[in-house]
Every structure is written in structure tokens, then in C-alpha cells.
């Protein structure tokens, strides 16, 4: 069995995980100080993930090991599980089923979990929610499960859109939710957004939040909440300055309390009335 040992964790190497899948990885597993990346054959890897080591190991059922070690993610009122974990959702919790290894947003990263928790703290009944950078659609689907009447997930990566639509169907979400390729601030994409939203959530990196802060304000009705994550704590000043520049109020910060030393942050704010 061919294994590539990459130093770090899913949290610290989050930005590089898609590169491994694109290079032909057949599975990823966090174990000790490394991410174990399984391949069928040795392949040339991008420079960003070239600091690991190749190993030949005795054959084992890594898929069985992966399934055994994967745990449900409890995010407020929502529990995110893999398809084989449906029976592990506690009574009273909303189940959100995501296949691990799909587009970004399986729920196992701290930023996704914090965003789902923040959505669960809002009354979304009858609300319109916009998810920017939707990836697998996990945040849009969480909003729909939590009662949103209309949810739109947008992403500039066309590969993610059919994946998000499939995930929604697999979760029984067939109306009131849609996914479209596009982004904020482009004239050709303006029509897809419609009227201002009651909630906007975005799991992107800090520099994009800085760039898009004005568009966030334009897409929200006055007084509506904004939820931003994907932010390294070291980048919080950049995001705070952007929100202040665009007139957002009630800016609050929370950091990840589980693993990774609290290096990830979530910021909530409200559009100025």
C-alpha cells in the first residue's frame, strides 16, 4: 500500500487538501503528527504539499480504518455525519449527511462547524439566506434544515455546483434551495441574487472577506446579520477594518475551542440600519 505522510493536520493543512484529491489521492486520514494520504501509485505532487514522505506499507483496509475513526460533528442543533453514520444522529438533532472527500465543507473543519453553530443561533424561519463560497453546500443546507424559506449557495468553482445539488437531494432538500456558479460584484451575476437577504454566511479566507465586504453590505437588508469564517486569528484585524469601513455594527468574534490552538475565528456583524 502506498502512503504519503504529510506533516500537519486537517486544520493546519486545510488549504492544501483539495490539491491532494486533485493529484489522485484515494483517501486521507489524520493520525498523530501527520496526514496519511493514500495513493494507488506514486505521483508528482504540487510544491505546496511536497514536504511529505512516501512509504510502502503492508496492505490493510484503509477505508475501514477511515470509517472507524471518523466521528459525527455536533454543531449546535445540527449533527453532520457521513452516509454510514445516519443512525448515530442523536434524537432531536437535525441530521446533515455529507460524503467525506467531496468539495470543501464536509463539516469536519472548525470553520464549517462554527458557521453551522452560528446559523443555529438565529431564527431562520421564513428567512432568505445567502451562502457565498458554498463548496459542498453544507452551510446552505444547514440553513435550509434550520428553517430558512429560501437559500442560495454560490461558488466561482463550477465543479462544486453539481456536487452541492446532489448533496441537497441526498438530504431531502428539493425546494427552497438552489446553487449557482457565480460571485458577488459582477454585473453578469447580479440577476441571480434578487432582493437583499436576511442572512449572509461566507466561509472564505480573510483577504476575500476584505475584498467582498462592500458586496456583503449590498446583499443584506438593513440590520441583517453577517457570518464570516475561514479566518485565521492573525488576520482578524484585516476583517475588522473591512467591516468598519463598510459600516457594519455589532462586530463580535469567537475562536475555535477545539483543536488547532484556537487559530480559526468566526466573525458576526450586522449591516447598518
Swiss-Prot record:
Role played: Methylates ribosomal protein L11.
Gene Ontology CC: cytoplasm
Organism from which the protein derives: Deinococcus radiodurans (strain ATCC 13939 / DSM 20539 / JCM 16871 / CCUG 27074 / LMG 4051 / NBRC 15346 / NCIMB 9279 / VKM B-1422 / R1)
Localization: Cytoplasm
The reaction(s) this protein catalyses: L-lysyl-[protein] + 3 S-adenosyl-L-methionine = N(6),N(6),N(6)-trimethyl-L-lysyl-[protein] + 3 S-adenosyl-L-homocysteine + 3 H(+)
Sorted UniProt keywords: Cytoplasm, Methyltransferase, S-adenosyl-L-methionine, Transferase
A Pfam family: PrmA
Record family assignment: Belongs to the methyltransferase superfamily. PrmA family.
Enzyme class label: transferase
Protein name stated in the entry: Ribosomal protein L11 methyltransferase
GO biological process: methylation
Alphabetical list of InterPro entries matching this protein: Ribosomal_L11_MeTrfase_PrmA, Ribosomal_PrmA_MeTrfase, SAM-dependent_MTases_sf
EC code(s) of this entry: 2.1.1.-
Keyword check for Transferase: yes
CDD domains recorded: AdoMet_MTases
Binding site for S-adenosyl-L-methionine: 112, 133, 155, 203
GO molecular-function terms, A-Z: protein methyltransferase activity; protein-lysine N-methyltransferase activity
Amino acid at each position: 500500500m502506498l502512503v504519503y505522510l504529510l506533516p500537519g493536520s486537517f486544520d493546519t493543512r486545510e488549504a492544501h487538501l483539495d490539491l491532494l484529491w486533485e493529484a489522485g489521492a484515494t483517501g486521507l486520514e489524520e493520525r498523530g503528527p501527520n496526514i496519511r494520504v493514500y495513493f494507488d501509485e506514486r505521483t508528482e505532487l504540487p510544491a505546496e504539499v511536497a514536504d511529505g514522505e512516501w512509504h510502502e506499507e503492508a496492505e490493510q483496509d484503509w477505508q475501514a480504518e477511515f470509517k472507524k475513526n471518523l466521528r459525527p460533528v455536533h454543531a449546535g442543533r445540527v449533527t453532520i455525519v457521513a452516509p454510514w453514520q445516519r443512525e448515530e444522529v442523536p434524537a432531536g438533532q437535525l441530521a446533515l449527511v455529507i460524503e467525506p472527500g467531496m468539495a470543501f465543507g464536509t463539516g469536519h473543519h472548525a470553520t464549517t462547524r462554527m458557521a453551522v453553530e452560528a446559523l443555529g443561533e438565529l431564527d431562520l424561519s421564513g428567512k432568505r439566506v445567502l451562502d457565498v463560497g458554498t463548496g459542498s453546500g453544507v452551510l446552505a443546507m444547514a440553513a435550509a434544515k434550520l428553517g430558512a424559506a429560501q437559500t442560495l449557495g454560490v461558488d466561482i468553482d463550477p465543479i462544486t455546483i453539481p456536487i452541492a445539488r446532489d448533496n441537497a437531494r441526498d438530504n431531502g432538500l428539493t425546494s427552497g434551495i438552489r446553487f449557482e456558479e457565480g460571485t458577488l460584484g459582477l454585473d453578469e451575476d447580479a440577476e441571480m441574487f434578487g432582493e437583499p437577504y436576511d442572512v449572509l454566511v461566507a466561509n472564505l479566507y480573510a483577504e476575500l472577506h476584505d475584498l467582498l465586504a462592500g458586496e456583503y453590505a449590498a446583499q443584506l437588508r438593513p440590520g441583517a446579520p453577517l457570518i464570516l469564517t475561514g479566518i485565521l486569528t492573525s488576520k482578524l484585524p484585516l476583517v475588522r477594518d473591512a467591516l468598519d469601513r463598510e459600516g457594519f455594527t455589532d462586530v463580535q468574534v469567537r475562536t475555535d475551542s477545539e483543536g488547532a490552538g484556537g487559530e480559526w475565528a468566526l466573525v458576526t456583524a450586522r449591516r447598518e440600519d
